[in-house]
Design a protein with these regions (language model features):
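Hydrophobic transmembrane alpha-helices
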Residues: 1-42
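Membrane-interface helix termini and inter-helical loops of multi-pass transporters
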Residues: 4-16, 57-67, 124-134
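Alpha-helical transmembrane segments and their cytosolic interface
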Residues: 1, 131-168
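Membrane-helix interface segments
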Residues: 38-43, 95-98, 132
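Small-polar-interrupted transmembrane alpha-helices in polytopic inner-membrane proteins
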Residues: 41-56
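Short helix-perturbing small/polar motifs within transmembrane alpha-helices
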Residues: 1-4, 58, 62-119, 155-163, ...
């Protein structure tokens, strides 16, 4: 996992970085969806999932068909609604800062909701209700704020993407 560091100016210079417990996967998918059509991103992400499940351990905690049984897989499935919601900006051709923030927040929320539903189905199937709140905190509540924060660096790319779309 490539950590995300935000430099902060503290009095103590030995700890001037704040590490975010997420990867650049979500912002990258959002950026690719803004640039390309959703069919291209769907295909690329589907190939990524197939590679991770059957060929090579490309996921965060490895790979293989056993990854289907982890709560993380639900959040990977949540990328599909994220792509659909972000692609609405391409369809409407209204890529601006306000629309991007609204659609970005909705997309991240939809991704987390998909992961929570997948997790809940697993909890019911395995009859392990005591793990639901733990998984909810670990995979959603603990990370959703950081995912929202990663929308702000992407704001710097909105104007160039908008110009690029007009040229095409």
């Amino acid at each position: 996992m490539l950590p995300v560091y935000i430099p902060l100016q503290f009095i103590d210079k030995t700890s001037n970085n704040f590490e975010m417990p997420i990867t650049w996967q979500i912002p990258t998918i959002i950026l690719l969806t803004l640039i390309f059509h959703k069919k291209v991103v769907f295909t690329a992400f589907s190939i990524y999932i197939i590679l991770g499940l059957f060929i090579s351990p490309v996921f965060h905690q490895g790979g293989s068909i056993g990854y289907l049984l982890t709560p993380n897989f639900g959040y990977l499935l949540g990328i599909y609604p994220l792509i659909i919601i972000i692609d609405n900006l391409n369809i409407k051709n209204k890529i601006n800062i306000g629309n991007f923030l609204i659609h970005g927040c909705l997309a991240i929320f939809a991704m987390h909701l998909t992961g929570i539903v997948f997790n809940f189905i697993q909890i019911i199937y395995y009859n392990q209700f005591n793990l639901f709140l733990y998984n909810l905190g670990k995979y959603s509540v603990g990370k959703i704020g950081y995912h929202f924060l990663t929308l702000f660096p992407l704001l710097l790319l909105i104007k160039p993407i908008e110009r690029f779309k007009r040229i095409k």
